[in-house]
Amino acid sequence: MKFCVAVSLLIIASMAGVISVSGYDVYPRDYAGNYYYCGVRKDPDCSKVCKLHGATVGYCHVKRCSCVDLPEKNQNFLSVIWKQC
């Protein structure tokens, strides 16, 4: 019973974006440290945002852009720009 509750909480937390399993859902941040939000009228194209940060592909997940295979060192926008200079 306790195992089922623990697994259920783990699944709910990973779906809500509270935790990431195996580094799959990594949310990039802009220059001010904010997440890129999507699902609104002027939403950014998450694939373009994630490729700018060095990830392979991106998608909208829980109203935030999520990147696949995004290195944690490239999560912040300024760290990516600093490497290009």
Swiss-Prot record:
Domain LCN-type CS-alpha/beta, first and last residues per copy: 24-85
Subcellular location field: Secreted
Example of a GO cellular component annotation carried by this entry: extracellular region
GO MF annotation list: sodium channel inhibitor activity; toxin activity
Signal peptide start-end: 1-23
InterPro entries per the UniProt record, alphabetical: LCN-type_CS_alpha_beta_dom (IPR044062), Scorpion_toxin-like_sf (IPR036574), Scorpion_toxinL/defensin (IPR002061)
UniProt main location, coarse: secreted
Keywords: Disulfide bond, Neurotoxin, Secreted, Signal, Toxin
Keyword Signal found: yes
CDD domains to which the protein is assigned, alphabetical: neurotoxins_LC_scorpion
Tissue specificity: Expressed by the venom gland.
Disulfide cross-links: C38-C60, C46-C65, C50-C67
Protein family: Belongs to the long (3 C-C) scorpion toxin superfamily.
Domain notes: Has the structural arrangement of an alpha-helix connected to antiparallel beta-sheets by disulfide bonds (CS-alpha/beta).
Name of the protein described by the UniProt record: Neurotoxin 60.35
